[in-house]
From Swiss-Prot:
Root EC class: transferase
Name the UniProt record assigns to this protein: Ubiquinone biosynthesis O-methyltransferase
UniProt-listed PANTHER family: METHYLTRANSFERASE, UBIQUINONE BIOSYNTHESIS O-METHYLTRANSFERASE, MITOCHONDRIAL
CDD domains (UniProt xref): AdoMet_MTases
Keyword Isomerase set for record: no
Swiss-Prot/TrEMBL keywords: Methyltransferase, S-adenosyl-L-methionine, Transferase, Ubiquinone biosynthesis
Catalytic activity annotation: a 3-demethylubiquinol + S-adenosyl-L-methionine = a ubiquinol + S-adenosyl-L-homocysteine + H(+); a 3-(all-trans-polyprenyl)benzene-1,2-diol + S-adenosyl-L-methionine = a 2-methoxy-6-(all-trans-polyprenyl)phenol + S-adenosyl-L-homocysteine + H(+)
Annotated organism of origin: Paraburkholderia phymatum (strain DSM 17167 / CIP 108236 / LMG 21445 / STM815) (Burkholderia phymatum)
Encoding gene, per UniProt annotation: ubiG
Amino acid sequence: MTNADPHELQKFSDLAHRWWDPNAEFKPLHELNPVRLKWIDSHAHLTGKRVLDIGCGGGILSESMATLGADVKGIDLSNEALGVADLHSLESGVTVNYEEIAAETLAAREPASFDVATCMEMLEHVPDPSKVVEACKTLVKPGGWVFFSTLNRNVKSYLFAVIGAEYVARMLPKGTHDYARFIRPSELAGFARAAGLLTADIKGITYNPLTRDFGLSSDTDVNYMLACRREA
């Protein structure tokens, strides 16, 4: 299997049936989604664009981008998650084309086919994130947008994203994240640059546990998002 960790895949496959429950394990994704969607749309203007959502899981971001008028394809390597995504798409009436395929495989099959690629909360779960970044560049057209989100690697992110979120607040199941796979912004920007992507914007994500609100910030110490463009 290309650039995939079977343990990571199984972890999310086991939770697939809970993906669209806004009060279950994926509650943080439901709460975060409006913030990341607005930020992506502010750069890429999604209406009418062909969009690829890499590591789409149950389709939370995929469906919301389609609702804005994008032609969305979602890919993942968890058959269980894709089954949930397909079923929810039928129930909601929001059209998304889902496929079980690796980004690298799709890049070889359909290079320069998308206006936008999103790869959110996924890079920290694969053995070689640089290969996914390279595939993202190949998949978008010249001038196309690529969006990433992941977790910084430092003491603060370990305390907040692992100890705080998984063990204290129990926002996430224990073992959701492997700290060793967290990626510093400089490392991700380096992967992007090596692939031929130009960094256009970086934003940190903040969380208020009292209001349960996510927001954008210049603080990239924990969660952050990176917007890139393929050179025209």
